[in-house]
């Protein structure tokens, strides 16, 4: 006992001693100057030499800028754990400032009489056809010259709106699609683009936007999640924090520390360290990133890369949270957040909004957030609501009075109705009547304009008007509230951060650079064996020409190797534009590090080439000349990288940038002095010769070689060396100083081009091709002065979807085409997949992973069934298994259709599957998409008129009549809104007249009103007697209770409920409430949310109940089993459904339908077709004027070489451009075909052959454009035979290049990988085509590849068809010997005119070869994994 007392006494004295030591440490810290004290803090850590235990921590003085990752994590965990929740944590921060009477800067945002108008095209004029594209370009040019201002219709987006966004209050922005929410947020953030007409005033604390920097004062969180896919979540947030800086945090902290010291206040140690670390952010610490990851739930994926469609990374919901968190690590006092909950479940959205609410209240921030479908508990977190529709503000004020305003107008929110949903639906003409509560008076539709006018007389509206009438007192503005600096960190720090960021990206993309190095090494090895020194001589001018070809190929390779910068930069541009617009850093802070970091790659590539080729080829052996070649290739590579960065920043679109890059490369090479000699370039193009980097490289590398000792022998008794004769004969300079002129010029080009890259990145914006579709009624309502038109499409990025006006449809039971109602039963379904290697590495020993476990159920005609479960429960997996959409894995169990075993080929004909991704051909209109689907999926005996009537009935059923002529477009880019695209997906399946329809998440990503429209569509379909099943993710009460039956799955792929919902979900609620311990549902609470909460994994652990086992033991399970047993037996009078053929249509009907669609798609894809034609016109004019009358010059060997050079350059560059530009087009169409082929619309071969066929007329036009212009300007011999031969070879050459691009896309997963696979073959075709080294000079071991090279056959045909029959004298390069063109072509190249027919057959044969391989790849290769 005495020992115990002594121990307690020692413990007490030890604690007193610790307290004294802590007091001494604090006193020592307080004696430091304030600035030094801001960097030091007391951090609780284990006593030295002891393990961390509860209550056994000691305070240690630390530098807050140097906290270890473990200390940062532990500090954040302690703070949030001690506070209990985020609200208490923010309250502690606020209390610390209040204790010393420091106020936070407040910002009030006002907008008065704000009007924003867009200019749009209407009707068929809005479709992106080739003629419309040309008209748009012409009109834009004339408008720029102020000559023409017509052609477009004005559409109001925001119509004279006014309001106040108050500090310390959370504002919710609600409104239906196309109401102007995004435009309002962009306008308030000072981010509207130049294409809109804006009037009105926007002020922050009474200051106009031009008096400060709004991009630094506020932060706009976009709907788009643009991030560097190679970076982890932590790295993304840390980089954003370093760029944005700490703003006023540091100054406020210093003042706080000064006042606390004066008043003798000792703050909490952990909170003190936390606030100091946040105020010193932007240096090396990342505590703010750690904190944001913790409160946003991103800590579980902190070290996971962000990823994209190519790289597996974080989920879509996590990416959306990262987008928000990226700006919260900054110092903006005003937050504009645009639909930040897309892809998030309601619980996560609630936590995020809750954090923002407490942050706004405690720190006096100003926050406005637009949400799609806020849950009731989320809606309650907001202080104010702004309700906007048709560009007019209907209500703005406290959330509590919004319902009262509409009640005064005669519209009441039902008891079980989400208020946010009510506010959006009450403005809709389709939904308004159900909320009318003045039954004594007849209902009349109240328009948005009437609501807006009524609000002005409402008490809240009057108060708002009175407040706006009194100008903001600018003297109340806190001096630190509005940012006047463009950037939050010093320029040097930004440069350093960018350097580290880009270095990290280079390391993460190291496989690209390694692949380029390996590719260059392989080509260097091939070059070494082609120009092998044992076959290379130095005896004549002809030998010199071979060396010139080798040097030229080296230059071309180094120049070509920079082309990958185009795709790499275009992929990064959205991120760079986002960073630029948010004022993360100036563009030069990005371009300078990118230039510096490219130096090592240039050193490696040029060094590798010289090291492998120089001495093996047999160049001049002097070491100084070897170093000279290395130095020259290094600066050429730097010039090449800069040139293609300029083209990428100028093009800004992959297809356009690739075209620009090809054009730049072509201009540089054709005027470089090798393909066409200097003497042969016309006077009007000689300026191009002098500004071509290739010219300086060609002259410098040639002088470096041919003035060497190896070429010093005297030439033909003349007073010059052989080397000088070669230089002179090829129009090259022979003075030594031209080497240094070349090096200096290339260095200068690298500097100038990098400057232009910076300039374009600063001045140019993303190409504004984002569009939306607005219905005819809507645009007439908004702009009554406009003449009637069908559709308005071209709204850029300011309208993201459309409101749909019309009348409710009656339930439809009969349609023009009958169908057979069918049921589907499935029993004991199990599904297994192979365990991925990454999971095995984590300790999983099984070879197979089971995703579905003994799932049993049934879907019946006229019954709408919901398939619900948390993420990972297996909802989509089950539906894919039942629909036969899985491409891998093992399936067990039985599936029957109306009692007969399911046959997949038959089932495809009678079922429809609406995928979540809404994949459609982007260049078709709505009605064309439906007619196309109906043509291929309805039986062949259905005539055209009946098919058309049926399609129109389906359009009426899904409410798409008003949008029949609208372009489908690409998701998030142009065309239909998300909600309209959902309904199109349903309609496309419905026109197949299916008996069973599967729908995967039909309401995901939609606002409440759009979701209601989609569900009304679904209910209409069910009422026709079809069998429908939908997966659904946490639906609202209205949506959930529109279903008849429910299949509820828990994580792991097990059913825990299968049966009817009952009225107001009574059956479901009674089933789960009968389980002991399950909490009862609250009145008015969403049954879907309740059932997910009470059946969670945590609840299972608390209750000790396995809900799947409970269901299997229940009476409900027995009833389901009995129903399945009954439906699994066919009726006596029934027959098994069979079809005579696999597809509805025969082969040629499939081919004709696919060709019809592809023809429309090509006609409406001007970025591909029109740009290709425009590029061809420019190239043909340029080549024709450069090669002026080349075809009529036939006196010397150089004349033949010049003509061949022009043909070679045209074939190679126009061909490669065709191959590159077709790859994204084929990739999109192949992606669409995966869905269409899975639906049984057609087989692979008709689809592939339609893509091959549709190119024929476009390539023909391209060939005619180039052939006619170039042939005329080049003055080739105008005979019918020679001209037709020229057109023939150009046509089939461009055709096989295009088919080659299609083939490389078909054999690779996507159009990003396709160019990488295709590029090495372009290089080999270039090397072995016979231009740089004739066939007779190619070593015997490589000569076979000359015959396997399609470009060599093209040059054979083009040159021989034009010059192969000429008998006139031809002067050779030595200036002495003469021969005939026939003999020269035969002796030098091995070309014979009588072989022309075989050559033509070979060129056409390559077209057939590539087309067949493309078709077979489409048929047998499937890169979609489900």
From Swiss-Prot:
InterPro entries: AAA+_ATPase, ABC2_TM, ABC_trans_N, ABC_transporter-like_ATP-bd, ABCG_dom, ABCG_PDR_1, ABCG_PDR_2, P-loop_NTPase. It comes from the Eukaryota. Disulfide bonds: none annotated. CDD domains: ABCG_PDR_domain1 (cd03233), ABCG_PDR_domain2 (cd03232). It holds the Pfam family ABC_trans_N. It is a multi-pass membrane protein. GO terms for molecular function: ABC-type transporter activity; ATP binding; ATP hydrolysis activity. The keyword Membrane applies. Keywords: ATP-binding, Membrane, Nucleotide-binding, Repeat, Transmembrane, Transmembrane helix, Transport. ATP 1 binds at residues 175-182. ATP 2 binds at residues 869-876. GO terms for cellular component: membrane. Belongs to the ABC transporter superfamily. ABCG family. PDR (TC 3.A.1.205) subfamily. May be a general defense protein. This is ABC transporter G family member 31. It comes from Oryza sativa subsp. japonica (Rice). The lineage of its organism: Eukaryota, Viridiplantae, Streptophyta, Embryophyta, Tracheophyta. The gene is ABCG31.
